[in-house]
Amino acid sequence: DVVWGCVSQVGDQSSNIGRYAVLAAGWPEHIPGTTVNRACGSSQQALDFAVQAVMSGQQDVVVAGGVEVMSRVPLGSARSTGMPYGPKVLARYDDFSFNQGISAEMIAQRWGFSRTRLDEYSAQSHERAAAAQDAGAFKDQIVPVFTDGGPVTDDEGIRRGTTVEKLSGLKPAFTEDGGWPIAFDT
């Protein structure tokens, strides 16, 4: 099986990109594929589902991963002409417009996480990830992918050299009135 995470399933990423990736790769048509949308955690959820399937004995082999090319997703394309929430959800939250970014703001405020604290945590997280990568901690977890530009053998999402000072220069991602979380922190 193939389980793929993708939050913005529109345009090139629409329908069931997990299944289409199987076909585009030239794999046999009998290999199924599915796509998971759990917002920012889609790829992690795909991996979790794959691990659960193998651990439970339901599958022998599952390929898991994720895809998202935000530059190919038109801004606002996930919204239709209607509301993304039904009347019961809107009633429950007094017609308050919410999303994951606003949720991060609310959590930061509720638990007293300052912008500095969030930036410190982000910088430390990337520093630790880089050290773990350098020590080979992820080598048995990543299968090399061969591209025209050469093999990809490491997680390229780690931002080496990230500092609190650099992060403090980034604008808040979700509010314009002094919010805390930036894209790097969430």
Task: Describe the role of every protein-language-model region.
Residues R19, E105, A130:
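Short glycine-/small-residue-rich flexible loop motifs, especially phosphate/cofactor-binding loops
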Residues N37-V67, A108-F138:
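Active-site-proximal alpha-helical scaffold in enzymes
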Residues V10, V69-S71, A129:
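Glycine-rich nucleotide phosphate-binding loop and flanking beta-alpha elements
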Residues Q13-S15, V73-L75, D154-E156:
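Short, well-ordered secondary-structure micro-motifs
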Residues D1:
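N-terminal beta1-alpha1-beta2 module of alpha/beta enzyme domains
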Residues R117-T186:
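N-terminal extracellular/periplasmic Venus flytrap/periplasmic-binding protein-like
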Residues W4-D60, D95-I102, S168-T186:
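Conserved catalytic cysteine-centered active-site region
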Residues V51, M55-R110:
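Flexible glycine-/small-residue-enriched beta->alpha junction loops
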